[in-house]
Amino acid sequence: MITITQTKSVEDIAKIQIIMQKYFKPHEIVSNNEFIYYIENYNKLYEGEDYFVYKIEDKNEIIGMLSGVKLNEFIVVDYFIVDAAHRCSSKYIMNTMINILKSYKLPIVIEAETESLCRLYQMFGFKKFSNPYKYIMLDVSMEENTSKILEYDSNLLFLSPCNLDFETTKQTIYKKHYMRWYSIYNDKLTKEYKKKLCV
């Protein structure tokens, strides 16, 4: 039986990282220590807001994860991944994931790099902003004294019904989600990102 439960366990995060390494690009993968630090300290650094992680298990084996940020304005889904061998249960997993996100009583937004992902989310009630959206991030897999800005076309979706304004939502994601993440690495990365956003 598949279960989805919240976790901050160091052991769980290590198992989740193994799945991430199978499917994510190197610049999208963070170290265990950095991930755990962020999970444990986010709500202390930003009062009233939180970073959450849910492990997806089948018979006590971790097969995926859902993570995101509860901001004051809305929920941002950060990572959502399920091991390929268990995607036959994707309908149940998606419905359970959405119910978990709805429990926060806030609007929900999610990024989708591909049209196939967009179609998947749209099957479960998400709608795509018609405005063009850029995925802007820094390559944190590089050496500490260097950084590289990665920018490519993506899509931003919201769970309907929702009255979020696109431009405000986009800027909030850039400045309150990504910029905060880079701040745990070093000042250079944060300055690079601020420069890109012109803030």
Give the predicted meaning of each segment:
Residues V82-A85, E113:
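Residue-level recognition of the GNAT/N-acetyltransferase active site
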Residues I13-D83:
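A conserved beta-strand-loop-helix scaffold within acyl/acetyltransferase catalytic domains
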Residues Y51, S103-L106:
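Short, high-confidence coil segments that cap the C-terminus of an alpha-helix
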